[in-house]
């Protein structure tokens, strides 16, 4: 929630799968403390983020749904019986005045669906990045951000390098102090690290020089050949060689 002279709910931070709609709405009610929200911004129509739109409208029928043209096309397709009394169709770089907060909408098609847009809070310098900069895992598990973030990136937008590059170019024009993704922790420190990784991944560049050999060996002969190949590579001073048995690795 962004709390200003007008209340705004952002789906990228709060909306959940429909199985958790009641819990989500209770959390919103507690935060608003009796006040009514003015806007619900829909950044991404994937069901794990959009499924609570119907429940939100039922509880707050006066709320204005904010999205782009493609957003509302998909809402009509996903929820054909849904009646939206108030809607605001925004364009690229259009801003929404919330009183002491100003939100700027930046379109990010195909990161990860065609309707995706991210939202930038010009006051607090926060980028609500939709599916961008997310990761798998839980907050109570100590692990390097990059491992599950890389796996998440490959699974969500790995084949959409050009759209990610387009979003990065737009993000470079913003003064970002905080990144709030749909999935995973809020990013607040060393943001250039995360941006540089997304730049590298979306350009399909390797993170380090090396050789990867993936194999499957039913009788062990192919494995023996792979091990011999590794020796040959080492003899030619290629030492960063990693092998993976596809039948036994995750």
Regions found by a protein language model. Name each.
Residues 1-11:
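Single conserved hydrophobic/aromatic residue that forms the stacking wall/gate
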Residues 67-189:
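Metallo-beta-lactamase
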Residues 19-66:
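Active-site metal-binding motif and surrounding structural segment of the metallo-beta-lactamase
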Residues 18-19, 45-49, 184-188, 216-221:
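Gly/Ser/Thr-rich loops at beta-strand to alpha-helix junctions
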Residues 190-250:
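N-terminal beta1-alpha1-beta2 submodule of the flavodoxin-like/Rossmannoid cofactor-binding fold
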Residues 40, 103, 126, 211-213:
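Conserved hydrophobic helix-helix packing surfaces used for dimerization/oligomerization
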Residues 13-15, 37-45, 65-68, 127-131, ...:
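Active-site neighborhood of phospho(di)ester-bond hydrolases with catalytic His/Asp-centered motifs
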């Amino acid at each position: 929630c962004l709390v200003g002279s007008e209340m705004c709910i952002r789906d990228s931070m709060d909306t959940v799968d429909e199985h958790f709609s009641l819990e989500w709405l209770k959390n919103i009610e507690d935060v608003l403390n009796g006040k009514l929200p003015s806007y619900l911004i829909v950044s991404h129509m994937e069901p794990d983020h959009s499924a609570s739109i119907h429940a939100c409208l039922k509880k707050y029928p006066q709320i204005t749904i904010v999205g782009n043209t493609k957003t509302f096309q998909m809402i009509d397709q996903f929820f054909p019986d849904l009646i939206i009394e108030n809607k605001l169709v925004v364009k690229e770089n259009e801003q929404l005045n919330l009183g002491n907060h100003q939100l700027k909408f930046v379109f990010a098609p195909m990161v990860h669906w065609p309707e995706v847009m991210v939202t930038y809070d010009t006051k607090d310098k926060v980028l609500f990045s939709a599916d961008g900069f997310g990761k798998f895992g839980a907050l109570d598990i100590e692990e390097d951000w990059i491992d599950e973030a890389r796996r998440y990136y490959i699974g969500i937008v790995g084949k959409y390098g050009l759209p990610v590059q387009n979003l990065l170019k737009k993000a470079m024009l913003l003064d970002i102090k905080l990144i709030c993704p749909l999935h995973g922790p809020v990013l607040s420190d060393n943001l250039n690290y995360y941006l540089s990784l997304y730049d590298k991944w979306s350009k399909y560049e390797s993170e380090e020089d090396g050789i990867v050999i993936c194999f499957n060996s039913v009788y062990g002969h192919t494995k023996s050949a792979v091990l011999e190949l590794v020796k040959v590579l080492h003899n030619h001073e290629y030492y960063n060689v990693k092998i993976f048995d596809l039948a036994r690795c995750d």
